[in-house]
Amino acid sequence: MPKFMDVHHGMHGVTPEALQAAHQADLDIQGEEGVDFQRAWGDPESGMVWCISEAPSKEAVQRIHERAGHPATEVYPVPVEV
């Protein structure tokens, strides 16, 4: 299944607990779109959050994030991994 990296902006001051809660909201509904969110990272200072997932499409990734309450600003395919 294709991999995707998505980026969220505007999450200034994000804490580990807030990031875990947002990630869990994705995990709770990811199966409805066939998405597998694997990991999330955050930078409280810049307000950026990044997520890596496997999904049938970038649109599926975006739909889950939107439904979970934190739409991604950008979603990129990750065609090469080492």
Each language-model region and where it sits:
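Short S/T/G/P-rich N-terminal loop/turn motif that feeds into the first structured element of a domain
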Residues: 1-32, 36-38, 43-47, 58, ...
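Conserved short beta-strand edge segments in small beta-sheet-based binding/regulatory domains
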Residues: 70-82
